[in-house]
Amino acid sequence: MRYQKLEIQEANWQWKYLLKKHREGENITKHTEQSLIELKVQFLTTLQHSPAEIEQWIKAEMTAEQRKRMRQSIRAKRKRFFNAEKLTTKKKSIDLDYASWLRLSKYSKTHAMTLSETINHLIDERENQHLYSEQMAKMKASLKDLLK
């Protein structure tokens, strides 16, 4: 396993995930009767600081498909959480005008690169172009000196 699972943290993420889904109007239990769902969710709200009981609630009250979706969401959250600890893997964001983003996106698609790779590629090209023009200017100057 690449990212360490911390039981208390995982349970807290699961608890928050379930309550968020419930607030969004999604059924987080295997039950269909509204009063029973409310009762089960009400019980879940009391379990915030009980990781073992949260796990038992999940096993008892959720369908396999619901558990699978929750696990995928928690796995993604765990990855983002641990990647955010290191500066090299932490995601950064930049603001682009739509037209700039569109041009960058088209360029990256035609060259089969990600947006990050495309930005690096364009910067490298520009730096190489600058070095080339400097070298050409030096060569022209030295040729002029030789011809004098």
UniProtKB/Swiss-Prot annotation:
Keywords: Cell cycle, Cell division, Cytoplasm, DNA-binding
Major subcellular location class: cytoplasm
Cellular localisation: Cytoplasm
Keyword rRNA processing among record annotations: no
One Pfam family cited in the UniProt record for this chain: MatP_C
Molecular function per GO: sequence-specific DNA binding
Gene3D superfamilies: MatP, N-terminal domain (1.20.1270.380), Met repressor-like (1.10.1220.10)
HAMAP family on file: MatP
The protein's role, per its UniProt record: Required for spatial organization of the terminus region of the chromosome (Ter macrodomain) during the cell cycle. Prevents early segregation of duplicated Ter macrodomains during cell division. Binds specifically to matS, which is a 13 bp signature motif repeated within the Ter macrodomain.
Name of the molecule in the record: Macrodomain Ter protein
